[in-house]
Amino acid sequence: MTAVAPRLENYAEPTRPAPTGGARKGTLAWKMLTTTDHKLLGMMYIVMSFVWFFVGGLMALLIRAELFSPGLQFLSNEQFNQLFTLHGTIMLLAFGTPVVWGFSNYILPLQIGAPDVAFPRLNAFGFWITQIGVVAMLAGFLTPGGAADFGWTMYLPLADSIHSPGVGGDFWIIGVGATGVGTIASAVNMITTILCMRAPGMTMFRMPIFCWNIFVASVIVLLIFPLLTAAALGVMYDRKLGGHIYDPGNGGAILWQHLFWFFGHPEVYVLALPFFGIVSEVIPVFARKPMFGYIGLVFATLSIGMLSMAVWAHHMFVTGAILLPFFSFMTFLISVPTGVKFFNWLGTMWRGHISWETPMTWTMGFLVTFLFGGLTGIMLASPPLDFHISDTYFVVAHFHYTLFGTVVFASYAGVYFWFPKMTGRMLDERLGKIHFWITFVGFHGTFLVQHWVGNEGMPRRYADYLESDGFTTLNQISTVFSFLLGVSVIPFIWNVFKSYRYGEIVTVDDPWGYGNSLEWATSCPPPRHNFTSLPRIRSERPAFELHYPHMVERMRREAHIGHH
């Protein structure tokens, strides 16, 4: 790692503004409440996402502690149900989706050379309505009947007023609706920003891969989140106003499953695609090479976006109410463009001069973990196998390998990669490596064994099991490693706090030395409107061409940079 990029002749060193002295108390809080600055909102999204990530992680530790040995330990069945319901919801709707908007809010306008997002006030509205929704869901714990306890999938009839009469369920539905509105607002903003605010010369096929992935994910959001919000309000209508939308005579549980999973499976790609984009930004910088197969990577992203709408019912194989061959085939098919992306990433690293700074280490953790999750997904796509392991811990393990592998590993890669751009200071490399290895070992120790305990027949969402079932040893291994995974956030939190105050100051535009996209062509942190001047944009690597002009003609001659 170098905090000092190679100097060029006539290169004017950017100056870092000095602190302006002590501000009045409450100034920061008022600034956050009223801001429409995409950079501050992006950091607020990221910080709050990680706060909710830690809350969801504590719930997970309580779940794992309860499953350490047979018999109920310290949670009742109802409390256990509430915890796994809120754990899943928090991780998906309060961490996974908002952290996408955190990175996209901060980085995307910089990458396309825009001064801000298209709708700054809508941006602020989306952030605050999302946080209100999350608080509403968690407020269920304060009600007499406790929080929602019907699972994060809200299956009916478990979620109707007869089986879940408490107010906590109503709070949960309100929270889902509010977070849905915030997500839709952010998606509209990103699509409009990309289509209308690109800098001169920034054609669609000169955009960074991260921007393409945010664009496709935002389009998916507009297609699925209104459906989730409407379907959830339908459940509320049944619960509170005596509606009969989900009566068994009208389709009941199967109708809800179709509506929910038509949202639920594309949502997995809303979570995955932006993080594919992050690793697609990290790998070329630390492999010292252009992205291999840029056009193919873009079309793989578009293919995933289209196919994501055609696989939802693979969650419903065991209902007997769907056409198994079609959904099995489509599930196998959607793995093809994802495999193409792996070849692009590996091709970029192939014969590159790889530098193992912390962002690249996290990216390799992503590649390994997500590959495992993808392979178990191929297994689950086969109905004969799925019949036996559906609703077991095998599915839990697969789900965590795909989502933790993408969202968490790539989020950490993004934080370590862009922290100097956001704050003007470097994170500590040694603490970053410690953080990575504790997380990597803790994660795989927790979830690898869950494949085996699921294959032995342990059902998910049960608070208890018998000693004679033979699940005890594997559950104990999983629980011990889950606490190691919980401990892994300590070096991360310490690293962020320490580096924000005392980290090595970045004095150049590009502390990594080989950045490609436009965010590396402005100061760290950027000025209020992002750029004092924009370089000429002739390819998808404008910052690299700005810093290494003598390389441009040679690379074009050797056809390393495409003419888009």
Curated annotation (Swiss-Prot):
Cofactor annotation remark: Binds 1 copper B ion per subunit. Binds 2 heme groups per subunit.
Membrane topology according to the record: Multi-pass membrane protein
Catalytic EC class: translocase
Annotated segments matching region Disordered: 1-23
Cofactor: Cu(2+); heme
Any GO CC annotation of this UniProt entry: plasma membrane
Positions contributing to Fe(II)-heme a binding: 87, 400
Residue ranges of the TM segments: 43-63, 83-103, 122-142, 171-191, 214-234, 259-279, 292-312, 316-336, 360-380, 399-419, 434-454, 477-497
Cross-link (1'-histidyl-3'-tyrosine (His-Tyr)): 265-269
Key word Translocase present: yes
Main location (coarse class): membrane
Keywords assigned by UniProt, alphabetized: Cell membrane, Copper, Electron transport, Heme, Iron, Membrane, Metal-binding, Respiratory chain, Translocase, Transmembrane, Transmembrane helix, Transport
EC number: 7.1.1.9
Localization: Cell membrane
MF annotations from Gene Ontology: cytochrome-c oxidase activity; heme binding; metal ion binding
One Pfam family in the UniProt entry: COX1
Assembly: Associates with subunits II, III and IV to form cytochrome c oxidase.
UniProt record similarity statement: Belongs to the heme-copper respiratory oxidase family.
Protein name: Cytochrome c oxidase subunit 1
Originating species: Corynebacterium diphtheriae (strain ATCC 700971 / NCTC 13129 / Biotype gravis)
